[in-house]
Amino acid sequence: MSGFYKGVAAEQETLFTTADKKLMRSTKFPASYDTKVDMKKVNIEVLKPWIATRLNELIGFEDEVVINFVYGMLEEAVEASKTSDSQNESTLDPRKVQLNLTGFLESNATAFTEELWSLIISASQNQYGIPEKFILEKKEEISKLKDRTEASKEESKTVTDHSNRRESRRESTYYDSRERNGKRTSRSTLDRKRFHDASDTERNRYGRSPSPHSRFSEKPRGERYDIRSYSRSHKERYEDRYRPTRRRERHYRTRDDEGFDEFGRSRDGRWRESRTSYREKHRYDRDALSSESDSGTQKHD
């Protein structure tokens, strides 16, 4: 029984090859399929990202089986082209690729295979094996990125110039008002001082000999930090804030102060005197009335 079932190799089986030939004869393929391609000149690794993205769009989800199936057909064709002696003979038949993908993609198999084959033809004509479409897309992407970078630089430069102009106007107004009031030196003197301070900073940064006006010069400990080492704009902008203001001295009430009672309540002196005289007057009137009433009662008695 073991020798009853006998089979043949796939190359010797004529059933499927005949069916494929009949299907190829009955199917109408695009004219670009007739172009022969040398697969040794094609960079397959560049095409793989596009193949995966395009198949996901057509299927609607990520199907690794179909993606790896297409990768396998391309890699097999490249290996076959390396052993082939003829450079004009194509080792990858796009018609077979379309028929193999019909079961997965159905009506989208023709569109996908035609796009893939056009990219393969373009890659074979390039010295780096990259399709011309990919090169143009990359150049366009680089150009857009460059435009965005330049736009951001221009925007930042505009903002910086605007802030510098506003700061310059503010300082100019402040300096002019100070000069009119005679509280500071002229702007030319200040600019010269700033120039010397900047020169000292550059010399100290690169390790040159320190300036006599530098904050790191050899001075006593109490005089080591020169006033010009601090930010002059910050100092001049906020120097008026710490000036003593002309305030009226606050008076704290005590019991010994005149015009306040023992509870700290203040009363006007005139009001107090008038109030006192009023009370004294009425007290005298009350005493007189009481004395008259007492005398009347005595007379009546």
Curated annotation (Swiss-Prot):
Record key words, sorted: mRNA processing, Nucleus, Phosphoprotein, RNA-binding
Composition bias type Polar residues, residue spans: 290-301
PROSITE patterns: PWI (PS51025)
Keyword Nucleus: yes
InterPro entries: PWI_dom, PWI_dom_sf, Ser/Arg_repetitive_matrix
Leader sequence segment: none
Pfam families: PWI (PF01480)
Biased composition annotated in UniProt, kind: Basic residues: 244-253
Renumbered residue ranges of the record's region Disordered: 145-301
GO cellular component terms, A-Z: spliceosomal complex
Domain PWI: 26-137
Location(s), subcellular: Nucleus
Comp. bias (Basic and acidic residues): 145-182, 189-205, 215-229, 254-289
GO terms under biological process: mRNA cis splicing, via spliceosome
Signal among keywords: no
GO molecular function, one term: RNA binding
Residues recorded with modification Phosphoserine: S86, S199, S291
Name of this chain's protein: PWI domain-containing protein C825.05c
Source organism: Schizosaccharomyces pombe (strain 972 / ATCC 24843)
